[in-house]
Amino acid sequence: DAERHEYRVDGVLLPSVTQVLKPLQDFSMIAPAVLEHARQRGIAVHIAVQLDICNDLVEESVAPELAGYLQAWRAFRHDSGIHEADFGDPEKPLYHPLYGFAGTPDVPFFFKKRWAVLDVKTADALSPVWGLQTAAYLELINANTPKGHHKVVDRYSLRLRENGTYRLEQHTDKNDWQVFLSCLTIHQWKGKNL
């Protein structure tokens, strides 16, 4: 259920990557209206990026306040030399059959001669949680990749800015997946016991 950000497999509700990582992020100091505005902006930018990848974006449909983010996305595509054929399926909901969690990785893509997962962000500041998030997305994609096909190897966050610039951050900490699994175990324990 995209509207509620819920994932079900055979009627069973699975925790999302976002839900699993929620205890690691404290947004209590940010006004709810500001958070909601940022959330809506992020959704709109993700839709624009997805449509741009698929060459389905109608320029006139982009709200003026989102133009800089789209400009940043296109600058990244230009600077990195990534073409349409270099992208996998964007925003494809997946679940992990072994670990029982789900999520929607933003963009699998071929970059620097290797498959990677790219998570698009519109936040003002970098977050260490993004490494954990991309580790979970990498594992989701690889768990759903048929044998004999290329696996995702690298993880990136792409922070798009309103002024049309971007920052690409590679996540290389090998512990990120283990930390995510620890969070998942705690989330599952709480669901059974509290």
List the model feature ranges, each with a label.
Residues D1-A102:
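Metal-dependent nuclease catalytic cores that hydrolyze phosphodiester bonds in DNA/RNA
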Residues L94-T185, W189-L194:
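Nucleic-acid nuclease catalytic cores
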